[in-house]
Amino acid sequence: SYKFETPIKKGVKTPIRIEWQPDGDVSYCGLRVAAPRSEAEKNQLSIWSEMSPDMDYYFIAGQNLDEVISGYRTLTGKASLYPKWTLGFWQSRERYKSSKDIEENLKKFRDLKIPVDNIVQDWNYWKLDSWGSHEFEAARYPHPQAMLDSVHAMNGRFMISVWPKFYDTVKNYKEIDAKGWMYHQAIKDDIHDWLGFRGSFYDAYDAGARKMFWRQMDENLYTKYKFGTDAWWMDASEPNVRDCTPMWYRKALSGPTALGTSTEYFNAYSIVNADAIYHGQRSVNPNQRVFLLTRSGFAGEQRYSTAIWSGDIATRWEDMRAQMTAGLNYSMAGLPFWGMDQGGFCVENRYVAAQQEFDKTGKENADLKEWRELQARWNQFGCFVPLYRAHGQWPLREVWNIAPADHPAYKTIVAYDKLRYRLMPY
C-alpha cells in the first residue's frame, strides 16, 4: 500500500489522479481516506466498539517487554511447545498436484543434501467438485498411506491444507448442515467461487460443529492414515467466504453464529477453528504435539499450538520490506511464531514471462535476474524468521527451480538454509 497527502478544503471538490498498472493474475485497487485530525484530537484517546453491550479493557504493565508478554499470556494462555522440526526449513508451493510431486521433490532435497524438514500440500488435493470432502483424489494420490510413509522414511514431515469451506454437494456439508451448523447466506445468494462451484463455511462458534469438523478431518486425513499427517494448515480462517467483499457483506456471509451476530464475534473465527483441531487431535493422539498454521489470528491463539503467517503477499521488494515491520509488530503482540510466504505469493507477470523465456531459451533476462535476486534476498531474510517457509505461485519455489546450481542465487539460498540449521541449537 502507498500513502500520499493531498490538501483539501471543506465543500470544495478536489481532483485526485491515480495511475494503476495491474501486473499479475488477479489485481485489486482500493482507495481509503484518512481524514486529518485537529491538534486537540491528536492528544485524545477514543476507544469504541461497533457492536458490544459490554466491553472489558485490560492494561498489562511490565518493567520490560518480556514482563508484558508474560502478563499477556497469563491472561490469554501459555504458548504451547511446538515440535522441534517446525524450526527447520519448509518447502511449499501453490501447489503440489500429486503424491509423485511430493515424494520426488522431497527426495531431490535429500539427494542434493539440502536441509528440509517439512513438505507442504496446499489446496485442491481433492476432486475438483469436492471441496470439503477432505479426501485425496485417487487418480493423483492413489496411495496416500504409501506417500506419507515415504515422506517419513526420508525423515520429512507432512503438512496439509484444510479449509473450513464445503461445497454444498459434498457429504460433509450435508452432515454439518443437517445440524444447522452451516452459514447459509452464500447458498441463498447463489455465490459460486473462482472454480465455478457453490459452497459456504461452517459455524466454528458452535462446540458441536467443531467436534464434527474435526471428526470429518480425522476420518479422512489423520486416524485413517495412522496419524501420518504431522501438521495442519488452516487456510481462509477469517473466514474468507468470498474474496474482496465489502465488510458489511462479509459479516452477512459469516453469520449468524452460535454465539450471536457475526459483527460481535467477527474477528474470533480463527481461534475457535483452531480449538477444534487442537483438542480434536489431542483427543485421538495425545502423545503427538499439535501444530497449526492459520492465516488469521486472535488473542490467545498461542495456547492452541498455532502460528500465523501474513497472508497472500506479492512478490515485490516493497512487500518483502513490509514483512519486517509486520513480523516485529506481530511478535510484540505476544504470539511467538510468525511466518510469511517467503518469496511472495502473488507473482508479477513480468517474472512469469521471464521464467517462461528461460525455459525455452536458457537465457536470463533482466526480469529473471531480478526474480532470482529477490528470491535469494527473501531467503536470507527468512532464515532469521521464526518460521522458515518458502511458498508462492508459479514460478516454482524449490531452489533448483529458482536457479541452476552454479548461480549465485542458488548458492545463497542453500547457504542460508544450512545456516538456519547451524543456528537451531541457539
Regions found by a protein language model. Name each.
Residues S1-T14, D23-Y28, A34-Y426:
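Catalytic-domain carbohydrate-binding cleft regions of carbohydrate-active enzymes
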